[in-house]
Amino acid sequence: MKVRNSLSALKKVPGAQIVRRRGRTFVINKLNPRMKARQG
């Protein structure tokens, strides 16, 4: 899980999903599980 300032590059990756949990924005990817990130 990476912590990034901007998730715009990660959300363009195929299979990416934007999820809001506990007031934070996450990117999860079922096709490529290494592409996980949280903003802030």
Swiss-Prot record:
Keywords: Ribonucleoprotein, Ribosomal protein. The keyword Ribonucleoprotein applies. Transmembrane segments: none annotated. One of its GO terms (biological process) is translation. GO terms for molecular function: structural constituent of ribosome. The keyword Ribonucleoprotein applies. It comes from the Bacteria. GO terms for cellular component: ribonucleoprotein complex; ribosome. Belongs to the bacterial ribosomal protein bL36 family. PANTHER family: 50S RIBOSOMAL PROTEIN L36 2 (PTHR47781), LARGE RIBOSOMAL SUBUNIT PROTEIN BL36B (PTHR47781:SF1). This is Large ribosomal subunit protein bL36A. It comes from Renibacterium salmoninarum (strain ATCC 33209 / DSM 20767 / JCM 11484 / NBRC 15589 / NCIMB 2235).
